């Protein structure tokens, strides 16, 4: 009996690292010290910072992985993994500095996992972020053969006096909603349940444009890094930012609001993405559950002063992101921090 017989092929693992080396190193910026394969990844703090603050974020892709693996779509979930982390980090005004990944599988499937890494590298390039390292764990008997799980970790950097944490949000500020690519990476346990009820396959079409359903559901999460960087470079006074993930607008938007203030949303200001209408109809999902599970077409939000709305919308449009003024900041009645959100079905 040896390790390979027990289900772990160390030689294949080494070959896999060599296979992915070039696409990983393409993400490396000048601050990276050394290459892939060491025990730790090393990176310099970029020049020009006087009082840098490091901002960290970690996340996964959830059960979207189940659907992706079912249909053999591995590249996109690599992008998803990066997006879920970097979109969190930028809400504090930080720019992503480096990314780490963790891949656990039942047995090493080099072709599928190489696609995942290529997707992660592509997401890092979109985010101007170095893929500094990672871990690939082969765990036979723990994960089924051919299955894998992903986790990501990102660190960003921002000047202390440029840190955005929501404390500057004021009554009367406006809320800018930036369009999502669809479902992104949250709510897929409900999505998969609906799919099993609706008896769909890889050829199922939906909506007035007859789009492929599975392809739409697996569309990678939008990465908002470059857009936020452009907004900050224009010195737009952003008082708060939120990444709309699990729990939708009702769960995520109030998280950054100071005590005594609430977001008041007008849901008629944007057109709900068709995929959510299909899910609601196919699964007979109550409207309240729809809003409390999915992003409903809004993937990221900015809170800005009223007189900066047009500037914010113009910058979004110039960078090919649809955006709308979807609401405003109002005073709450009970002065509690997490007292919810107004204007959304509850």
UniProtKB/Swiss-Prot annotation:
Keyword annotations of the record: ATP-binding, Cytoplasm, Ligase, Nucleotide-binding, Purine biosynthesis
One of the GO biological process terms: adenine biosynthetic process
Catalytic activity: 2-formamido-N(1)-(5-O-phospho-beta-D-ribosyl)acetamidine + ATP = 5-amino-1-(5-phospho-beta-D-ribosyl)imidazole + ADP + phosphate + H(+)
Main localisation: cytoplasm
Keyword Secreted: no
GO CC field: cytosol
SUPFAM superfamilies hit by this protein: PurM C-terminal domain-like, PurM N-terminal domain-like
Classification via InterPro entries: PurM-like_C_dom, PurM-like_C_sf, PurM-like_N, PurM-like_N_sf, PurM_cligase
Entry's Gene Ontology molecular function annotations: ATP binding; phosphoribosylamine-glycine ligase activity; phosphoribosylformylglycinamidine cyclo-ligase activity
EC number: 6.3.3.1
Disulfide topology: none
Pathway annotation from the record: Purine metabolism; IMP biosynthesis via de novo pathway; 5-amino-1-(5-phospho-D-ribosyl)imidazole from N(2)-formyl-N(1)-(5-phospho-D-ribosyl)glycinamide: step 2/2
Xref: Pfam families: AIRS, AIRS_C
Compartments where located: Cytoplasm
Family from the record: Belongs to the AIR synthase family.
Entries under HAMAP family matching the protein: AIRS
Official protein name in the record: Phosphoribosylformylglycinamidine cyclo-ligase
Protein source organism: Prochlorococcus marinus (strain NATL1A)
Gene this chain is encoded by: purM
């Amino acid at each position: 009996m040896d390790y390979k017989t027990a289900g772990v092929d160390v030689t294949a693992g080494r070959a896999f690292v060599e296979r992915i080396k070039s696409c990983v190193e393409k993400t490396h910026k000048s601050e990276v010290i050394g290459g892939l394969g060491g025990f730790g990844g090393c990176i310099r703090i970029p020049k020009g910072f006087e009082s840098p603050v490091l901002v960290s974020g970690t996340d996964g892709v959830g059960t979207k992985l189940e659907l992706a693996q079912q249909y053999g779509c591995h590249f996109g979930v690599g992008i998803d993994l990066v997006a879920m982390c970097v979109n969190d980090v930028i809400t504090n005004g930080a720019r992503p500095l480096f990314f780490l990944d963790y891949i656990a599988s039942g047995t090493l499937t080099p072709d599928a996992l190489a696609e995942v890494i290529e997707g992660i590298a592509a997401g890092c390039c979109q985010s101007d972020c170095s893929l500094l390292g990672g871990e690939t764990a082969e765990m036979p008997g723990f994960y089924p053969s051919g299955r894998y799980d992903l986790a990501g970790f990102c660190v960003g950097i921002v000047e202390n006096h440029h840190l955005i944490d929501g404390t500057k949000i004021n009554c009367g500020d406006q809320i800018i909603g930036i369009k999502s690519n669809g479902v992104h990476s949250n709510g897929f346990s409900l999505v998969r349940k609906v799919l099993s009820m609706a008896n769909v396959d890889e050829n199922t079409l939906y909506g007035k444009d007859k789009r492929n359903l599975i392809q739409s559901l697996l569309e990678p999460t939008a990465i908002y890094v470059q857009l936020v960087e452009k907004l900050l470079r224009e010195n737009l006074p952003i008082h708060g930012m939120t990444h709309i993930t699990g729990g939708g607008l009702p769960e995520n938007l109030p998280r950054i609001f100071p005590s005594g203030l609430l977001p008041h949303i007008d849901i008629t200001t944007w057109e709900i993405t068709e995929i959510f209408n299909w899910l609601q109809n196919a699964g007979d999902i109550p409207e309240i559950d729809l809003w409390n599970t999915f992003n409903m077409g809004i993937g990221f939000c900015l809170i800005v002063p009223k007189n900066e709305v047009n500037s914010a919308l113009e910058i979004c449009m110039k960078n090919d992101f649809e955006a709308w003024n979807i609401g405003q900041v109002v005073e709450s009645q009970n002065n509690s921090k997490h007292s919810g959100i107004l204007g959304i079905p509850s």
